Design a protein with these regions (language model features):
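Flexible, acidic/Gly-rich N-terminal and inter-domain linker regions that tether
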Residues: 2-127, 139, 460-479
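Short, compositionally biased leader-like segments
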Residues: 19-42, 415-447, 495, 501-506
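Generic C-terminus detector
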Residues: 462, 468-533
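Short glycine-enriched, charge-decorated loop/helix-capping segments at active-site entrances
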Residues: 147-153, 243-250, 315
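Conserved alpha-helical substructure of the radical SAM core
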Residues: 63-84, 94, 98-208, 212-221, ...
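Radical SAM/AdoMet-radical enzyme domain recognition
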Residues: 160-177, 186-304
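C-terminal functional modules
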Residues: 396-491
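Radical SAM enzyme [4Fe-4S]-AdoMet core and its adjacent flexible, acidic
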Residues: 4-7, 13, 20-21, 264-434
């Protein structure tokens, strides 16, 4: 680990410009030193203390990738952004041209990241639209990017308006995910799911900790009727893991009960583990093996812990990244999956997301990239001639290697079957229902936080928070820049005003959501870290 001269992530590792400047004062005249890093590129980021937009350098050092930036008020910061420099630099070939939405919602006025969204500067449409229907939760996790707690409940009418606007901007939206807070405790979550399914939206997901599914028979019956894909919080098996990450050491039996009930109800599940350094990285392999064996689970979405919202103190130079999780998968599954099985996702910025698919037949696990050279079809830099059926296979692979791919869905299975036609996997005799039992997906998603925020990545983000006034804000901007805090404050005030209006018989006309970053920056500078209504 590099030597740090300051605390709290502001340290100057050996080789940094500040370190070398200080060392130069001690160096004999006439001698020079080479930096121990390669300057790779310049981007824009934010100060983790005051959220000011500042320049940031991307550096390659010790086979890893770091971000270095300096705030004129708060000094230098460094953070690990990718634990494999070679994979990071080669990922650019997977950078697919973006898809333009049917229309934008905001104009360019202040510049990225303060014009969300989506504004015309944004380079990708919304593959996944996330609706946070409430801020309340039935858990109090120490690690919670949403900082869940008392606040607001969206109304069914508001959610229907959000869905209609999403259809207007996307035409045929691919995925809507209901989130929170804990969306399962919203009293109208079932009508909300029905509203999404009644519109031209391909897949509807419910992001949940599973508590209500484990304990509420009537809710489980209602959920089984509408059949959303369940995006299921599952961080491992050790009590200590859940004590540190979720604040409840003995929650595993409840989660296993929920998964078994989902299997009996026929609802597809994607496990979503948050992986924190020195907490549960040792459980990655066991999670993979469990997912393959459990009848409800069609895939896993590993998410290296990011530090926005509510989180413990952390060392930004020691954070988990996608290559760290892939390495753990390889080491802990005895080669069932290796690093070469995972391919960056082209629709977002390629270092944000990696995916692999495997054909499962008994004890045999065969990752698709071992029998089909995915690079031949997803390399957007090299001008390659595709083989026969190449365009059809390319289209199928682009669908699989997309942030909107839903494990176990009919569309994903069809695309997998087309890909298999090029590599001889034994799928031809299976219908899609049977094929679902043989296809397993592992995704890895690394989100930005105030330490790793990269404007280049943000501008191609395809996961957007959908708000009641029509704004679609990239997920990482919503969590890092100050949108979440301002939106929550205004939505909470809006709910109180609605209640007062209903009590007095006054027609309630909700004011639009507005975002004031000059005021936010000033509030942060004063050390309050909160936003006015």
């Amino acid at each position: 680990m590099p030597t740090l001269l300051l605390l709290r992530g502001k340290g100057f590792p050996e080789g940094s410009e500040q370190f070398m400047f200080e060392q130069s004062l001690k160096t004999e005249v006439g001698t020079k030193q080479d930096a121990d890093y390669v300057f790779y590129e310049l981007t824009r980021s934010i100060c983790p203390e005051c959220l000011r937009v500042i320049d940031a350098q991307i550096l390659l050092r010790d086979t890893k990738v770091f971000m270095r930036k300096r705030c004129p008020e708060h000094g230098f910061f460094e953070a690990l952004v990718y634990a494999d420099a070679q994979a990071y630099t080669s990922a650019s070939k997977y950078n697919k041209p973006g898809t333009i939405p049917l229309r934008y919602t905001t104009a360019i006025e202040h510049g990225c990241p303060h014009d969300c969204g989506l504004c015309p500067d944004h380079q990708q449409h919304a593959c996944v639209g996330i609706i946070e229907v409430n801020s309340a939760c039935n858990m109090d996790c120490p690690l919670c990017f949403a900082d869940a707690g008392a606040g607001f409940n969206l109304t069914l009418e508001e959610v229907e308006g959000i869905l209609d606007h999403f259809v207007e901007t996307e035409g045929h939206p691919e995925v809507v995910q209901f989130s929170g807070g804990e969306p399962s405790i919203h009293p109208q979550i079932i009508p909300m799911i029905k509203a999404a399914k009644a519109r031209d939206i391909q897949y509807v997901m419910l992001n949940t900790n599973g508590k209500r599914i484990a304990n509420d028979d009537r809710f489980l019956e209602q959920l089984a009727e509408v059949q959303p894909v369940i995006y299921f919080q599952f961080d491992g098996f050790d009590a200590e893991t859940y004590r540190i990450i979720r604040g409840e050491a003995n929650i595993l039996p409840e989660k296993l009960r929920a998964l078994d009930r989902l299997a009996a109800s026929g609802m597809p599940v994607v496990l979503v583990p948050a992986i924190e350094r020195d907490v549960n990285e040792h459980e990655v392999g066991r999670i993979v093996k469990f997912g393959i064996e459990h009848p409800a689970v069609h895939g896993i979405n590993f998410q290296p812990a990011f530090h926005a919202g509510r989180h413990a103190e952390h060392d930004p130079l020691q954070r988990m990244t996608i290559p760290d999780v892939i390495r753990s998968i390889e080491e802990q599954t005895d080669g069932l999956f290796t690093s070469t099985d995972f391919v960056p996702v082209p629709c977002c910025f390629p270092t944000c997301n990696s995916v692999t698919y495997a054909y499962i037949d008994g004890d045999t696990v065969l990752p698709l990239p071992r029998v089909l050279n995915v690079d031949d079809y997803l390399d957007y830099i090299t001008n390659r001639v595709l083989p026969d059926l190449g365009n059809e296979i390319k289209t199928a692979l682009e669908g699989l290697w997309s942030s909107s791919a839903v494990p176990g869905s009919a569309k994903t299975l069809q695309q997998f079957a087309i890909s298999c036609a090029a590599c001889g996997l034994p799928d031809g005799s299976l219908d899609l229902g049977e094929l679902a039992d043989h296809v397993f997906t592992i995704m890895l998603q690394d989100f930005l936080d105030p330490w790793t925020f990269n404007q280049k990545n943000l501008m191609k983000c395809c996961k957007e928070i959908l708000l009641p006034d029509g704004k679609q804000i990239p997920f990482c901007a919503y969590n890092s820049v100050g949108y979440r805090e301002q939106a929550r404050s205004q939505l909470t005030a809006r709910q109180l005003a609605r209640v007062r209006a209903e009590r007095t018989g006054v027609v309630f006309n909700p004011p639009p959501l507005t975002f004031n970053f000059n005021q936010s920056l000033s509030t942060y500078k004063n050390g309050k870290k909160e936003w006015p209504n």
